Amino acid sequence: MAQKPSIPKGTRDFSPEEVAKRNYIFNTIQTEFKGFGFQPIETPSFENSSTLMGKYGDEGDRLIFKILNSGDFLKKADKDALANSDSLKLTSSISEKALRYDLTVPFARYVVQHQNEIEFPFKRYQIQPVWRADRPQKGRFREFFQCDADVVGSNSLWQEVEFVQLYDAVFNKLGLEGVTIKINNRKVLSGFAEVIGEQDKLIDFTVALDKLDKIGEEGVKKEMREKGISEEALNKIQPIFNLNGNFAEKIEGLKTILEGSETGQKGIEELQFIQNAIEEMPLSVAKLDLDVTLARGLNYYTGAIFEVAAPENVKMGSIGGGGRYDDLTGIFGLKDMSGIGISFGLDRIYLVLEELGLFPATVTENTKVLFINFGEKEALYAMKAVKRLREENIIAELYPDSAKMGKQMKYADKRSIPYVVLAGEEEINDKKFTLKHMKSGEQSNLDFNGLSGALK
């Protein structure tokens, strides 16, 4: 019995309709990227493991897909690691390459490798797939596209302002209202760790804090205790959990909490600059909100942190995110190169637009007219018209076989082709075409110019 074909969990096939809708999102994002002055690049689907490992924290490293070395990889495997079931040590001896986890670290590698060819500040966008060995769930896949925009070579806070505007511009074009752009600052998080005397546990602290929405206040505190953060420190951070109000009110609360931290106060100043600029240039469909628990458990953000939440009436995780990473290129030997970037979560944006019915009907339009095939002579006459229509940017097809007319009409109906053309011996003699509207059944006898005009 033949094996039933399947695809790996966390991956998907896409139908023509789905591809058309995805391309609508891609094109919308790409148009705005270009409008904001970003240039496109592409990087390989896999990188050297040394490029990726250690850049995303322990959690991220575990989600990187490793690629086995070519040939008999076990010959060069670490025998002690194999005997002792030491998976980490064994992996490094049998795998030297890995599928990219995101587009940001490969971009940092690109900048360092091509620094002599780049004009700084360098604004780039990149739309390519990434892979993560995550547990699949709604809106979370093991293979998915990221749509990134980054700027390197400038530490100006106007870049942060511009990225907020970029998010808003894209969601405005997609007709997606009610999106919340959450913002925080890594310096604020460092300030929290400083005022409670736990600077050495900053990563543990922020990773736990970032889970507040998922596991609640008590869950966060429990995880912090497990990481060795003292009860006294937990009492000091209680005001963080009680911080609420609008952006300005939260800022005032932060000033009190971080009164003893110079780093934290610097983070507050940066947040205020961004908020003041956005107030002067109001957003169209999105809302900017300060979320002091937002940490995005990655190792490379050093300033602003962004996360985009879908409208409240849609149950969905984040649909975008990013931040400033002043030290990212430093890991590849290029020091003092400040950068900031954001990413759009295409797959989740797709699900949100689908759920809210926001895809325009025109997105899935394909062939405009199908010519019925009555035989070789008629097919040649039809094909000449098809060629001319295509030259006028009208999508036209000839049914390939001279099958029964009912079968051809059914084919047009199943594919939602709005028009069919009948061109038999009579039409050929008169140099005409019979155009039929599939829904209404209305027919018109037209010359080519009339046919072309009716289809435009």
UniProtKB/Swiss-Prot annotation:
**HAMAP family of this UniProt entry?**
His_tRNA_synth (MF_00127)
Disulfide pairs here are none
Spell out the InterPro entries in the cross-references: aa-tRNA-synth_II, aa-tRNA-synth_II/BPL/LPL, Anticodon-bd, Anticodon-bd_dom_sf, His-tRNA-ligase, HisRS-like_core, HisRS/HisZ, HisRS_anticodon
The subcellular localization recorded is: Cytoplasm
Keyword terms of this UniProt record: Aminoacyl-tRNA synthetase, ATP-binding, Cytoplasm, Ligase, Nucleotide-binding, Protein biosynthesis
Gene Ontology CC annotations of this record: cytoplasm
A GO biological process of this protein is: histidyl-tRNA aminoacylation
- Quick one: which gene encodes this? hisS
Q: What is the species listed in this Swiss-Prot or TrEMBL entry?
A: Christiangramia forsetii (strain DSM 17595 / CGMCC 1.15422 / KT0803) (Gramella forsetii)
Reactions catalysed according to its record = tRNA(His) + L-histidine + ATP = L-histidyl-tRNA(His) + AMP + diphosphate + H(+)
Name this protein carries in UniProt: Histidine--tRNA ligase
